[in-house]
Amino acid sequence: MSEFKRLMRLKLKMKQKRPEFKRQDWFKCSRIGTSWRRPFGKHSGMRIGLTHRAAVATVGYRGPALVRGLHPSGLQDILVNNVKELVAINPEIQGARIAATVGKRKRIEIVKKANELGIRVFNVSKQKQEEFLSL
């Protein structure tokens, strides 16, 4: 087993064990939401790290450095806005993600070109790809 595959498996296991980091007192007031904010209060049990409090995001929860930020498939995620940007992608180590601002017509062109070049498109399902290729 290669080192890369081992690290990808380790990354997946670490992600499964990683707790969901929620903002302090998120359950008291729906207005503040659950998105993570570091606790700064003088008497905050969460900041101190009391065992019966929610987990605080720290360096120890990070994944392996070599595979950090990669797509679960192991490919590097590249944002694409047009067909020209597809040409610069290396299909062996990179995959494309079509930007949200791209319309349907250009999206179809990008999917067709990506299929020709053998590039994986992350945010288009297999059914949509087949539909786009048949047009």
Curated annotation (Swiss-Prot):
Keyword list (alphabetical) reads: Ribonucleoprotein, Ribosomal protein
Q: Which residues form the signal peptide?
A: none
Q: Which GO terms describe its molecular function?
A: structural constituent of ribosome
Q: Name one GO cellular component term.
A: cytosolic large ribosomal subunit
Q: Name one Pfam family in it.
A: Ribosomal_L32e
Q: Name one GO biological process term.
A: translation
Q: InterPro entries recorded for this chain?
A: Ribosomal_eL32 (IPR001515), Ribosomal_eL32_arc (IPR023654), Ribosomal_eL32_CS (IPR018263), Ribosomal_eL32_sf (IPR036351)
Stated family:
Belongs to the eukaryotic ribosomal protein eL32 family.
What is this protein identified as?
Large ribosomal subunit protein eL32
- Per the record, the gene is rpl32e
